[in-house]
């Protein structure tokens, strides 16, 4: 019997990846990581998944690369049927584990929900998602209901200095130099 305290469920949950399909017959599973370097997902422990009864701790026995896939062995999932029960579950950790960022760097989770306003004061809408492209991140902005340009959604590059002029996370606003008609 262990004297270790059981890890506490996340207070500020953040999704770090997703458990994919079973791999083989011994309970291994594919993992899809949302971290910049795929295997960095293992730096954030403990993992939790959301189940009908609440947060469930996921203990990793091991992990490895197989071809281009990351695969994991979860404690208690010793066959394909047990592994299949975890398929499509989101991997969640407490956001307090994320490292502090430097000035001018932001986590996407902090940008989502911010109101985006042009330098002329036109409200473009709220960020509902972020996308990664080959060259830069892009804000997915849901336009206001009565948008003068009839736009429902805008894609605006998150380029500091060129497009993004000011980010105020405490006020949940981002000022951009962007043509609302574009």
Curated annotation (Swiss-Prot):
Position of the signal peptide: none
Domain of life the protein comes from: Bacteria
Spans traversing the lipid bilayer: none
Keyword Cytoplasm attached: yes
Disulfide partners: none
Domain notes per entry: The PRC barrel domain binds ribosomal protein uS19.
Function: An accessory protein needed during the final step in the assembly of 30S ribosomal subunit, possibly for assembly of the head region. Essential for efficient processing of 16S rRNA. May be needed both before and after RbfA during the maturation of 16S rRNA. It has affinity for free ribosomal 30S subunits but not for 70S ribosomes.
Annotated family: Belongs to the RimM family.
Protein name: Ribosome maturation factor RimM
Gene that produces this protein: rimM
């Amino acid at each position: 019997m262990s004297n270790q305290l059981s890890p506490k469920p996340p207070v500020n949950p953040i999704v770090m990846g997703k458990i994919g399909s079973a791999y083989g017959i011994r309970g291994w599973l594919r993992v899809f990581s949302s971290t910049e370097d795929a295997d960095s997902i293992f730096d954030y422990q403990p993992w939790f998944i959301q189940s009908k009864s609440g947060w469930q701790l996921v203990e990793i026995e091991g992990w490895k690369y197989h071809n281009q896939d990351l695969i994991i062995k979860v404690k208690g999932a010793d066959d394909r049927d047990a592994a299949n029960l975890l398929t499509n579950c989101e991997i969640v950790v407490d956001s307090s584990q994320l490292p502090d960022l430097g000035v001018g760097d932001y986590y996407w989770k902090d940008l989502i929900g911010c109101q985006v306003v042009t330098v002329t004061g036109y409200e473009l809408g709220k960020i509902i998602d972020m996308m990664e492209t080959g060259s830069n991140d892009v804000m997915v902005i849901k336009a206001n209901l009565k948008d003068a340009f009839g736009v429902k959604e805008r894609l605006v590059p998150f380029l500091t200095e060129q497009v993004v002029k000011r980010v105020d996370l405490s006020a949940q606003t981002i000022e951009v130099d962007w043509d609302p008609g574009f």
